[in-house]
Amino acid sequence: MSDRTIVVVGGTSGIGLELAKDVIAKGDRVVITGRDEARTKAIAAELGDRAEGIALDISEPHSIKGQLAGLGQVHGLVLAAIERDANTIRDYDIDRAIRLVTLKLVGYTETVHALLDRLDPSVDTGIVLFGGRAKDRPYPGSLTVSSINGGVVGMVNALALELAPIRVNGLHPGIIGDSPFWED
């Protein structure tokens, strides 16, 4: 068993949950976050004694620092929290767009900022930010998502520069075939 702790924001479903399972399988400790406290804690309990669940809604960035205050040293951070969106220019929903920009750009940034003094400053520490393929291949209704995911690229580049030697990478998957979004 390892003393390494990996935080997976958005770790209660989808890719985030699968990554959390992989972290545990490798012998590390994982902290998963999700918006719903009861659900997050239940999923952490299912993952076992090397998992902890914390309620965290990164679309409310002013609460992030306080919600993560109890964490010790962090050896890896995965930012995989998302919300689905179908915002077109003809039916543009400003409030929905603001929420998504806040969640993915401001929320991701504030999460890194809140954990900065606890991120092990070594090349063995990594941060992974999830964007999405829509940054390069937009689809009908992806106006906001495509724009935000382009912003994730800029964020990855800036964080890599500012946080070296910590590794910072971005992943931009397309629609995952076994996800609920695929069924829609």
PLM regions and their residue ranges:
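Rossmann-fold scaffold of SDR-type NAD(P)-dependent oxidoreductases
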Residues: 9, 74-83, 129, 169-170
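A glycine/serine/threonine-rich, flexible loop-to-helix segment
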Residues: 176-184
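Conserved mid-core segment of classical short-chain dehydrogenase/reductases
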Residues: 79-98
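Rossmann-fold cofactor-recognition segment
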Residues: 46-62
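Catalytic loop of short-chain dehydrogenase/reductase
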Residues: 90-91, 99-101, 107-111, 120-164, ...
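Conserved glycine-rich Rossmann-like NAD(P)H-binding loop of the short-chain dehydrogenase/reductase
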Residues: 26-42
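Conserved Rossmann-fold cofactor-binding substructure of NAD(P)-dependent oxidoreductases
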Residues: 59-73
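N-terminal Rossmann NAD(P)H-binding glycine-rich loop of SDR-like oxidoreductase domains
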Residues: 12, 20
